[in-house]
Amino acid sequence: MKITEETELITYGIHFDEEKFKPAKQSKERSYINKPDGGLWCSPVESEWGWIDWCTAENFRTGSLKSGTKFKIKKDAKLLVISCYDDLLAALKKYGTRDFRFLYHEKVLNFDAIIHDGYDGMYLTEIGNYQCHLPMNGPAWASDLNAWDCESLVLFNKDIICDITYFGEKEE
């Protein structure tokens, strides 16, 4: 799936609030799982294996699936797209940073560097998730995206979010 300004995105259990948005940044605590601290996590509504599917299959926070936010992103949004394992390797070569706390791999994504390069978010496609979740034949230096679980995006920049609608009751 290609993400365009027409693609409807969804996040569950969150009524997006611009005032409470926490900008994404590199996290020493989360770097080993290749996730930034902050940002807004979402999946395409039309995804064949998105957040709602993973939560339902794993019986994870299913109560949160009753409410959330639907939105789109602006046409000029710049996304780092990981649609295959080679895309992840290229991103690790360009934006990789050493993290020796990671037992098996020495390079993880440096989200501060990705953001500094002007990216508004990162999109892991369904095929990208399949290939990058637990690759068995990658180079020893390369980490994976095992903790991403499904086709998803993490948005670093709240200013690209538009056409917001809420559903369900807001969780406090």
Predicted regions and their residues:
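Active-site and NAD+-binding cores of ADP-ribose-processing enzymes
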Residues: 2-28, 57-172
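A short, exposed loop/beta-hairpin motif centered on an aromatic-Gly-Thr core
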Residues: 22-43
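Acidic, low-complexity intrinsically disordered regions
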Residues: 37, 47-50, 137, 144
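A residue-identity detector for tryptophan
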Residues: 41, 49-54, 141, 148
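Helix N-cap/beta->alpha junction signal
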Residues: 44-46, 84
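Short active-site loop/helix that positions an aromatic residue
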Residues: 46-62
